Amino acid sequence: MSSRYLFTSESVTEGHPDKICDQISDTIIDAILAQDPQSRVAAEVVVNTGLVLITGEITTKAQVNYIELARKKIADIGYVHAENGFSADSCSVLVALDEQSADIAQGVDKAQETRELLSEEELDAVGAGDQGLMFGFACNETPELMPLPISLAHRVCRQLTAVRKTGQLPYLRPDGKSQVTITYEDGRPVGIDTILISTQHTAKIGEITELSDIQAKIKEDLWKYVVEPIFKDAEIKPNSQTRFLVNPTGKFVIGGPQGDCGLTGRKIIIDTYGGYSRHGGGAFSGKDPTKVDRSAAYACRYIAKNIVAADLAEKCEVQISYAIGVAKPVSMMIETFGTSKVDEDKLLEVVKENFELRPAGIIQNFNLRNLPGERGGRFYQDVAAYGHLGRTDLDLPWEQTDKVELLKQAFSPQLLATAS
């Protein structure tokens, strides 16, 4: 790759059709696990003009009003205007749910699993809920150890939502997207090439009715109230060469489920690293913690983040894979892209010895079953928009760096030699 290149990542707001589905799916997860932490949940949601369909496989003792949950989440997002073609009060909500397949359950369910703390033998007895491969990544481009492009794209969308919900820009509507292109030199971010924002808006703004004037007003406001606050204290800022694009089609009045059908699990790159790292293909939202697509991807992020936080590497990508019904990973790989300061073979061995990667162990260490109940019925839905990883606004167990000292001690002679 050239020493100078551009890299782009995108994000979407919580009002994007696919993200509505992710949030409803994870709201269902929260509600069920808060009542019955041993539940098995695979909740899929589809939204279209005036319609919500909740489907999937759920095995639980919890009593949940799925229709009420969906309507409340839709209202919280901001779909309360009937003229948008989709609103919490007027949309139809259909529910079509089955129980989890007995063939799948037999490889995962064990009597010991209902206890809080499991022995080594019991951890080995609880298999993965499916086969699959998962990735986790961290790099030192941002304080939260995430790639800069996706970090900024999420910040733009979160600020876009904030100015809408506070009424600062009352003409904005819930649907929106961002895209940020970063200039890199020798593998390090050095500039902001392009900032793109597409945001749904009302047909007129106050007395402004001309389309060109409306778009000019939106562009001016978004720079002042969205872009400038984000970059106020940033080390890398937009400059006179930075392109700022807003609603490039010239109009974005029809949006949300009226404009596009939405489906759970279609924003997996936005949920993770913005394309900067590889992805195993499995979505997160709507899945209980026994699904390794979700829990093991969180564990991979935890490993990668601790390695970078310990300054053992500038970049780190972790891959693990599982077989259905088998507790221990089939394979594990650590890639540091030539930035490792320690022996990579030893690094892999140290990680295997000190990080729990059996599904029941991940669930136990991160407390993934009990967090919805402990946090008032709200945990997974909060990561269903604006990224599951690198969230500085949330207390997430997989974002902790509590293994840093252990890793440093394991490599202290090598690190001292490298420093000298």
From Swiss-Prot:
Gene Ontology CC entries for this record: cytoplasm
Record-listed K(+) binding positions = 44
Gene that encodes it: metK
Per its UniProt entry, which superkingdom is the organism in?
Bacteria
Name of this chain's protein: S-adenosylmethionine synthase
Q: Which Gene Ontology terms cover its molecular function?
A: ATP binding; magnesium ion binding; methionine adenosyltransferase activity
Transmembrane portions of the chain: none
- Compartment(s) where it occurs, according to its Swiss-Prot or TrEMBL record: Cytoplasm
| Entry binding sites for ATP | 16, 175-177, 251-252, 260, 266-267, 283, 287
Q: How is the cofactor bound?
A: Binds 2 divalent ions per subunit.
| E.C. designation(s) | 2.5.1.6
Function, as annotated, reads: Catalyzes the formation of S-adenosylmethionine (AdoMet) from methionine and ATP. The overall synthetic reaction is composed of two sequential steps, AdoMet formation and the subsequent tripolyphosphate hydrolysis which occurs prior to release of AdoMet from the enzyme.
Description of how the protein assembles with itself and partners: Homotetramer; dimer of dimers.
Q: Which residues bind L-methionine?
A: 57, 100, 260, 291
Keywords carried by this UniProt record: ATP-binding, Cytoplasm, Magnesium, Metal-binding, Nucleotide-binding, One-carbon metabolism, Potassium, Transferase
Q: Example GO biological process term?
A: one-carbon metabolic process
Which residues participate in Mg(2+) binding? 18
Annotated catalysed reactions: L-methionine + ATP + H2O = S-adenosyl-L-methionine + phosphate + diphosphate
Please give the cofactor(s) recorded in the UniProt entry for this protein: Mg(2+); K(+)
HAMAP family for this protein:
S_AdoMet_synth1
Coarse class of the primary localization is cytoplasm
Among InterPro entries, the record links this protein to: ADOMET_SYNTHASE_CS, S-AdoMet_synt_C, S-AdoMet_synt_central, S-AdoMet_synt_N, S-AdoMet_synthetase, S-AdoMet_synthetase_sfam
Return the annotated region ranges for Flexible loop: 100-110
Instruction: Cite the SUPFAM superfamilies for this sequence.
Output: S-adenosylmethionine synthetase
Q: Which family does it belong to?
A: Belongs to the AdoMet synthase family.
